[in-house]
Amino acid sequence: MNRIIIIVSFFMLASINIYSQNLTVVDVFEAVSKIDGFQEMDYVEDDIKFPVEIGTPKMIIHGNAEPREQVLRLLKNLPESSLVYDSTDERGKFDRIFINTIIYDLLYVHIGLGGNDTVLILFRGGNRKCIDEFIKDIRGFDY
């Protein structure tokens, strides 16, 4: 009987909800990529204009905004200081950029409304100076 309790306790600990952890931008990207309906897509530079120097992109897309709440719950577990850009319209559609300043991974998140796509692009291995300049340009000031 004690063995069963120990095994059950272990599995309960092992399945602790990812929504309750402190996450990195890579953790968020990987967790979102596992949400039903997300697909990895080729990043096409002509479609979305990000400087090449900010890193190697990996993009996932969901065909609508259905996973909005799940994505928002994950994003809330990033450090507040990681949010470096936020453009939210009056209806709640947004574009946000998060950064891990220790290793300079950058995460772009677009969430539309209703039938609009949900897009996440993770940039890794970018040039720190170029990332700083990019953020300064889009914000209009240093962060």
Could you describe each region identified by the protein language model?
Residues 98-129:
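A short, solvent-exposed beta-edge/loop patch
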Residues 4-16:
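Sec-dependent N-terminal signal peptides
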Residues 1-4, 21:
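Positively charged n-region of N-terminal signal peptides that target proteins for export
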Residues 128-143:
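Surface-exposed amphipathic alpha-helical segments
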